[in-house]
Amino acid sequence: MKASDTVGRQTATRSVWESRALKNESGLLALMREAVRNSTTVCVLSGANTWRSRWVKYEIARAVIEERGLLAIQVDDVEPNRATPERPGLNPLHVMGLYQHENGHYYLVERHEVVKDLSTGALGFEWRLYADHPEPLVPPRYVGDIEMGRAAPLSLFTAEHDFLTEDGATNMAAWIDDAAAQVGR
């Protein structure tokens, strides 16, 4: 089934996810697993701070592990009640990646903010093993070559779109279909 054939998609606001997280982490995980059951693609709607969310990273990781299509859509400037749009945040697919160990196995990794210069307080990023899935995995078919001993962000292998400048209302279903096709679905 193509995204363009789907009617009545279920959406959830941030408050639904956050309230579930505050009550019970296992309840939130169950809600998330049910929400994406039978999906072919995970479409990350990216705002100013989406890249920081543990739960967004979790769903990205599940998409990689389950070999589902993956894409990001910037929605920073879509909010109609905001007088000025937020500055675009990092693409969450840029802070999640895959690492190819010298033994040939692939692992999920995530970027963590670290202080790079104590005298100036300058921040940078470093790759660390993704704690919620430290086991090796088979990379999805859309992942290209990764040099052994190196990490590569998922954004190198996936599409990123801007909802407003690329007419997301018209094109989003096609973007999702393209991401699904990358994994043969």
Model regions: which residues?
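Conserved N-terminal substructure of TIR/SEFIR domains
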Residues: 1-38, 162-185
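Short, charged/polar micro-motifs that form catalytic or ligand-binding hotspots
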Residues: 22, 29, 46-53
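Inter-motif core of Ras-like GTPase G domains
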Residues: 39-44
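Conserved TIR/SEFIR loop-to-helix hotspot centered on a Trp-containing motif
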Residues: 49-65, 81-85
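A short helix->loop->beta-strand "cap" motif at the edges of active sites that frequently abuts
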Residues: 66-70
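Generic beta-sheet signal
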Residues: 73-75
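Conserved nucleotide-binding/hydrolysis micro-motifs of P-loop NTPases
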Residues: 77-79
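C-terminal interaction surface of TIR/SEFIR-family domains
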Residues: 81-185
